């Protein structure tokens, strides 16, 4: 049964992919040139939203240009975006997020931005200076990781419902719990000092837990029983000796 579902899904996505090619071909030719069918093989990516309501696929129509199609399977409502990468649906199928070029000339190469789209009305939000992104499992928050600055990063937490953002700088390590409600992270301290461990409630950005230790923390991991982490041990001289 699982194998049959995969075949049906693949066939369905290929059908809507071919339908999307109508915008690639110019004009309304009755007879197609044979070389045009090569475009059918350039399906870069496809998938369904968790609810099965939306389908998305990326088709490359030229040597460098590709288009992301996002279509509602029932209503036929469709969005199109050029030259995107890493599209991701939220778990509740209400949002899609992806990376795209900013369109600006940058000496070091192509500059990218992150675009968040509300599938209900097409409303967009743009975020700059982001290296990676993901939705929390409860679809309440979009976590945007900034570019590395030394051995620390900057996190931007975007509340999807309230449309507000919280910035946390100097993060060394972070992890979100399986429910998507809590964020645990360690903060880089000033030179010569240890880091600190904090736990934030993502719903209202309330700090639930704060711990400081002269030795510091690392290797954070959420489990079904709570947060696990390692505490660095040091001797009387301050030299690191191990972990517990």
PLM regions and their residue ranges:
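Blade-terminus and WD-like Trp-Asp/Gly-His loop motifs, strongest in beta-propeller folds
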Residues: 46-54, 87-96, 133-142, 174-183, ...
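Beta-strand-rich domains and repeat architectures in extracellular enzymes and scaffolds
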Residues: 34-68
């Amino acid at each position: 049964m699982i194998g049959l579902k995969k075949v049906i899904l693949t066939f369905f996505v290929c059908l809507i992919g071919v339908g999307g090619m109508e915008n690639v071909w110019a004009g309304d030719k009755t007879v197609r040139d044979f070389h045009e069918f090569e475009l059918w093989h350039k399906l870069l990516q496809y998938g369904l939203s968790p609810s099965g309501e939306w389908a998305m696929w990326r088709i490359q129509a030229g040597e460098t240009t590709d288009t992301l199609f996002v279509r509602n399977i029932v209503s036929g409502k469709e969005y199109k975006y050029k030259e995107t990468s890493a599209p991701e649906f939220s778990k509740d199928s209400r949002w899609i997020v992806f990376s795209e070029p900013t369109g600006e000339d940058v000496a070091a190469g192509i500059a990218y931005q992150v675009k968040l789209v509300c599938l209900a009305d097409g409303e967009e939000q743009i975020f700059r200076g982001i290296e990676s992104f993901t939705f929390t499992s409860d679809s309440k928050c979009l976590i945007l990781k900034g570019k590395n600055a030394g051995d620390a990063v900057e996190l931007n937490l975007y509340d999807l419902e309230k449309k507000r953002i919280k910035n946390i700088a100097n993060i060394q390590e972070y992890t979100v719990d399986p429910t998507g409600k809590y964020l645990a992270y360690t903060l880089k301290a000033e030179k010569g000092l240890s880091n600190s461990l904090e736990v934030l409630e993502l719903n209202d950005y309330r700090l639930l837990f704060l711990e400081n230790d002269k030795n510091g923390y690392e290797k954070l991991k959420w489990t079904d029983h709570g947060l696990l982490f390692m505490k660095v041990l040091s001797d009387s001289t301050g030299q690191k000796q191990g972990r517990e």
